[in-house]
Amino acid sequence: MSAIELPPLRSRSEEAARAEHNAQTLAHENANIAGYDESPAVQQVETDAPETKGAPQASFKNYFRVFSYGTKLDYFLISLCCFTSIGAGTAMPLMNIVFGKLVGNFTDYFIPGSNVTRQEFEAEINKLALYIFYLFIGKFAMSYISMLAIRISGMRISAALRLAYLRALFAQPVSVIDTVSPGKVANRITTSSNIVQLAISQHFATLFQSLAFTVGLYVVALVKGWKLTLIASTGLPFILIVYGAMFPPFLRIHQITDKFQEEASAMAYEMFSSIRMIVAFGTESRLAKQHGVMLSKAASNEKRAAPLMGLTMSPAMVAMYGIFGITFWFGIKEYTKGRISSVGDITVVLFSVMMAVMNIGRVASPIISIAKAATAATELFVTIDASFHDTSGVMEPEVTGNAAITFINVAFSYPSRPGVPILKGLDLTITAGKVTAIVGPSGSGKSTIVGLIQRWYDLLGTTATAKKIDETEIPSSSTMASSPIEAVYDNTDKKSKKGKAGEEEEPEQDLGPNTCTGSLSVGRTNLRNVDVRWWRSQIGMVQQEPFLFNDTIYNNIVFGLCGTRYEGLSKDEKKIMVDEACREACAEEFISRLPQGLDTLVGESGIKLSGGQRQRIAIARSIIKRPPILILDEATSAIDVRTERIVQEALDRVSKNRTTIVIAHRLSTIKRADSIVVLRQGQLVEQGTHEELLKNGDGVYYGLVHAQELEMDAEDDDDHSSSLENIKMNDTKEDTASSGFEGHASREDSTYQNVGLLHSLGRLVVEQRHHWILYSVCCIGILGAGAVYPLQAYIFARIINVFTLTGPELVKQGNFWAGMFGVLAGGVGLSYYLLGAASHLISVELTRKYRSEYLSNMIRKPILFFDDKVHSPGSLTSRLSSDSQQVQQLLSMEMSMALIACTNLLGCTIIAFVYGWKLSLVGLFAALPLILGAGLVRTRLEIQLEAENAKVFENSSQFATEAVAGFRTVLSLLMEPMIRSRYDKLLKGHVVEALAKAKYGTIIFAASDSLELACMSLTFWYGGKLLASREYDLIQFFIVYTAIIQGATAAGIWFSFTPSMAQATGAANRILSMRPTSTDPSSYSPLPCSDEGVGIEFQHVSFKYQSRDVPVLSNLNLQILPGQVAALVGSSGCGKSTTLSLLERFYDASSGHILYNGQDITTFSPAEYRKQMSLVSQEPTLYQGSIRENISLSVESASDDDIKQACRDAQIHDFITSLPEGYETRLGPKGMSLSGGQRQRISLARALLRKPKILLLDEATSSLDSESEKYVQEAIERAASEGDRTVIIVAHRLATIQKADVIFVLGSGKVLEKGDHQALLRKKGVYWQMCQAQALNR
């Protein structure tokens, strides 16, 4: 298989207008999507989306444009498909010619006084039957070649399109990618791409074959009798007018529905990404309900298409049977006047036009698929066409990374807030080869400096890199939920939009021209003139929240070599560099203890490692390429004191002879810096060494240091022999779970029952039996539509027999039976209309219900379920979308058509046996089993192929969404080519695996598609013998023949839906398997009541993760009295956060007991037990929606007074009320429109609103600057001072827990020391040494 080739990325000048518009649209459509309830954004989409100028408009030209992603091989395969599809399509028109000759021979033989002998009749019949068999062979070969060719090209082009989308996404500016939800990426790269793939493969071949079929039939009809053909074609304009009027509104409705589905997918991704917080606060039901609101709006919109779906088949069927009546009526007139010499000519014209018109109805399915693909492709092309800038420039030797970085009079504001300057005339020189630390309060510009150095933004005079969105082209920000909070920072003290560490985060959309003046240079070269990729290869960066890929530790570190001169080294040479980097980052010790060592999988975002372990791997990754510039953005914030000291010494070593930029809030880490730069409000206010800056008692730096000082009043001692390095603390997994654990923790029921179609889908339908009215309408429609075929066989036989009559009787009988076709047309039209509309309503409602239930069941799974690497957020989001879509596709018109086929087959079998059992036995039990057997084998192959497709595309989707989630890391590490390469490799693997099965599956498909002709050949041959002996008359023969052919057609229709059935069955099984097992509530004990807080006791508790040989907790014993403030400290991996996880019952202990007021917590209902506690984690979790919604999420119902009091307790009320919209201010994704401290205090308010008996704080202030930490710390102390609440704090920064009632120092899974701050200092043990490391005044 040749490589998947892609067209080159478009230059800035190419298609500039379209690119500019799509860049605006991309930023617009990804801007903060409003959250929960009846948001204006959702209402706007529902009512105005089709008219919104900024929204991408679906166009069929985008469907055809998809083919431009093919290669010469693909174009050859497509051409071959077109040619062979024409051949396969013309088989039936040629068969009609033969059929006409047969009918003529039959009537000539049975006309009274005929001179045709039996021998002559049999010889002619044998010859014509053989011709039909030759047509079967030709159609089989052509069908196989066309379907195989288009499947190959369709898979290849689809893979190229997916890769182009991902490549274009990573070519966008940071400001644009920042606004892209990974959930949307998952939806587009799976669901949307799958829709496109289906439309450019199977449905493309079907459409082309159908067009050739239709044209061929009309050519045959016109040759046989052009007047009769024109009469027979009178229904065609009616069909074209109806379909032409139907599709535009159908496209608009579908496009709006897609928007709702994308929003629902984005929200689902957020939920899966923060599942621990959801479980801790018991918000599963509320968030699932909000997700259901979005799905309900999508369903309400999609129900508007029900009348249109009713017209999918109805017009074609009405026209077809109407044409039958009109054509026979006119043909009989012409026949009696001698203008038509043979009844065979009438039959050929009639059947040709009839089949052509009927085929127009069948063309509806691929056309609808193509219409959906046009919408899906438009969404993909918005990103693909978005403009980007040339990143090339000078590199070595013209410029070097070993040069000073100079800011000269730099003024900068983000595009989203052009009136809020972040940097104000900054003049700063970062000396080459020296360590420069940058400190300052939140919003002072620290992270902005890093962003400018990394060239996430450029200084361009008066405009920023991000594109400006023309507000006349898009809805107002209020309707699209571009965060209103951005507009109000002019009037607050917190003027910058902040992200990690409370610093400025890049804007989420561009709203106008912004200030970007001044000069930024490296040496004597302006940074704008430097090649971006080369420049980033000179920088090693460690961020505060390290992002690791779901890969091995080794690969995560080797990723640091991407885009550098070391990238091409051998594996052995890279291994040496990895080992060296691990030693320098102090990561070698804990890696060596892991069973798989460097080959250990780190899990989604490094979930299987502790925060300290993740950080050290990130440090190793940043220094492995030996960069001349090292940027450490809070590189040690998540590391314990012992590890911090070791890592800090390592960083001191690697910083030598290297330009190092350190951003830190924990000032103990930057005491040794060569220069400390103090920023305030975007300006440099102080600069010097640690000692020099401390001399200014009124300075900003002095105030920051004073806020972090520890009380060290214990008597000094010269005995420091027990160094931190000699304290053995197991560095095992701390913060999160691995793939499993030992003990009796709650596991998901992994039993997956792969039941059949009737059991799985039938169960879904039966459970919704309250829709019995719609079900009844569907049944009536199915019975009516299915009964048409036996009735058609009977009426057709009667009309053919009319031509054996003469004179007035011929005209009388002919007119009567022609009129009966008109009656049949009215009945079948009504049946199909009712069926199409009702089945669509059922499918929409069932899909809404079960997609909502699917997510609700997913988020109620045990935490272990989400620890599994196959259940990553991206994978689950993709599955949620694709499984629901597959079920809906089948439960709509597809299932109805399959049921009609069953009714048809049954009715045709009955009428055939009633009128001629001999011919029926031959036709139905000799030829038909071949069709059934081919279909069954095809079904099995399609199921296997579907399983492979789902597996591979799920993996590729997971990889893509993970890459988007960590895009800053991807850009910083120059991993874009590697990401594309690995994604390309995944896609190619899918293509190869899928095609291996497609070769055999296509044989069966071609057989089931063409065996109808073989059945006809056999029927005519044997029927001819029965007619020759006059055992059968014409009425008997044509009733049986038509019934057999209709039965074979029905079987073909049934098996044409087997791929959808296979996919939908698997999807339904997955949906049902997510249902939880019921638990008897009476088996739980009631919670003991207490007004003085809760006493917590660990009795001999041990805990071990399944993938770890070393236990995290080993016989842990500790007791916390009611109302106490307890702190847990210790090295990374000592079990601090695991202790909180056990308290939250994310996991259960392997052995021992955890007591809640003296009672084992495993005896309580987990939901009721968790209502007694609240968790505030290091990384606050906020969702799209208003501030009020985010705070009140933790309780079922809360009054305004309760919410405001919780915010006052969390010291965030004043800030919220300073916003123009106050508590109704809407937040963007993850609440990134707030600073870190503001997000943390909102999280604390949410926790306090529950009025918990137990408050758990897991590194709640570790990522905050001194100013924000002060606010949060005061809020925590206020919450703990009430005396009726037990507070448990996990912290690395010891200044935050020195006032705790009791401090537990953990190590090796046990308590090493306990006591209050002063008592532990007097011991001069582990805690004393930890304090020594953080004492800034020592």
UniProtKB/Swiss-Prot annotation:
UniProt topology in membrane: Multi-pass membrane protein
Domain of life of the source: Eukaryota
Role played: ABC transporter; part of the gene cluster that mediates the biosynthesis of KK-1, a novel cyclic depsipeptide with 10 residues which is a promising active compound with high activity against many plant pathogens, especially Botrytis cinerea. Is probably directly involved in the secretion of KK-1 and thus confers self-tolerance against KK-1.
Name of the protein in question: ABC-type transporter kk1G
Membrane-crossing segments per the record: 75-95, 130-150, 203-223, 230-250, 312-332, 340-360, 777-797, 816-836, 895-917, 919-941, 1003-1023, 1037-1057
PROSITE patterns referenced in this protein's UniProt entry, alphabetically: ABC_TM1F (PS50929), ABC_TRANSPORTER_1 (PS00211), ABC_TRANSPORTER_2 (PS50893)
Compartments, record wording: Cell membrane
Cellular compartments per GO CC: mitochondrial inner membrane; plasma membrane
Signals that turn on the gene: Expression is positively regulated by the KK-1 cluster-specific transcription factor kk1F.
Compositional bias annotation for Basic and acidic residues: 11-21
Keywords: ATP-binding, Cell membrane, Hydrolase, Membrane, Nucleotide-binding, Repeat, Transmembrane, Transmembrane helix, Transport
GO biological process entries: oligopeptide export from mitochondrion
GO molecular function: ABC-type oligopeptide transporter activity; ATP binding; ATP hydrolysis activity
Residues at which ATP binds: 440-447, 1130-1137
Reported phenotype of the disruption mutant: Decreases significantly the production of KK-1.
Main location per the UniProt record: membrane
Domain ABC transporter per the UniProt entry, residue ranges: 405-706, 1096-1333
Domain annotation ABC transmembrane type-1: ranges: 80-372, 777-1063
Region listing for Disordered, in residue ranges: 1-21, 473-518, 715-747
Pathway: Secondary metabolite biosynthesis
Gene3D superfamilies membership: ABC transporter type 1, transmembrane domain (1.20.1560.10), P-loop containing nucleotide triphosphate hydrolases (3.40.50.300)
Pfam family, one: ABC_membrane
Similarity comment: family membership: Belongs to the ABC transporter superfamily. ABCB family. Multidrug resistance exporter (TC 3.A.1.201) subfamily.
